Amino acid sequence: MIQLSAELLGRGYAPKINDFRTAAIPDLTEVIIERRWLQNHFLNTIFISFETSSYDPIRARFVICAFRAQAALVAYDRAKASCEAFFDTFIDGNPVVDLYFDAVAQWEGVVLHLHHVVDIFKRANGNDYSKSNVEKRLGDVANRIKHVAEYIPTSAHQGLTIPMWLAHDGVETSKATVTFTEIADLLVALAKHLDKWQDPIALLKAEWP
């Protein structure tokens, strides 16, 4: 079996692909269960009387955030499973590329869905999330993914094959890193808030911590 150098694999496939052999990815099994945030919120609004027009923007924020949170949790579960499959089949100098890129795609989904949620509530509350280190870095990673077409022909891309890659402690770009633990913590916090926010009265007072 041919074994390729880490440098060649990194240049041809993805940075650090041959170094990605283990990862500390928190288990969110207890969080990744069937959630009924959307259904519960819908039913709760039926029995509460308030000015519909003034609640419409709040409702929109909740629906978008709830479905993206659900999507992020599903993607997180799949990303963790893909990483574990990649590690189980790992061969130094000859990694299973398809499994690696499946994991990358799932982690990109987690980042993008989670960033949408953070951005919506920060803007709604008029908060400056640039002052929050984790959320700022999450935004930097998300923007690299979304705007990769703009970076490819520029020096900012630095000859990279993909905008985001995987390291043993988290996801990385040329600009920022967010650890798997930080991502898990944000998802856990979001799930707890949505558990409360499915009640419209609580949602009216909602603020991102």
Residue ranges: model-predicted function:
Residues 132-157:
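Histidine-centered, metal-coordinating catalytic motifs and their short helical/loop contexts
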Residues 1-137, 164-209:
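Amphipathic alpha-helical interface segments
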Residues 154-166:
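Interfacial non-cytosolic loop connecting adjacent transmembrane helices
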